[in-house]
Amino acid sequence: MTFTIEIEQEEDGRWLSEVLELPGVLAYGQTQDEAIAHVQALALRVIADRLEHGETVPQMANIFSVTQ
């Protein structure tokens, strides 16, 4: 499974990125790359937390795809 990262620039210039398949997983950054890196790290933490609590997670080979 691939997680889709949607990214857009806010009016204040910051970038907001969100993992569409993981509700609530979003992050800001001063640049596109920073916002993407932050949301990828957060998504991996969420997935690790789910695994720790015995929840199933989708099989992952190519984890992220970025869209604008």
Residue ranges, per PLM feature:
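Short, charged, surface-exposed hinge/linker loops at domain edges
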Residues: 1-4, 37-68
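A short, exposed loop/beta-hairpin motif centered on an aromatic-Gly-Thr core
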Residues: 23-34
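Short aromatic-glycine-(Arg/Gly/Cys) micro-motifs in beta-strand/loop hairpins
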Residues: 7-22
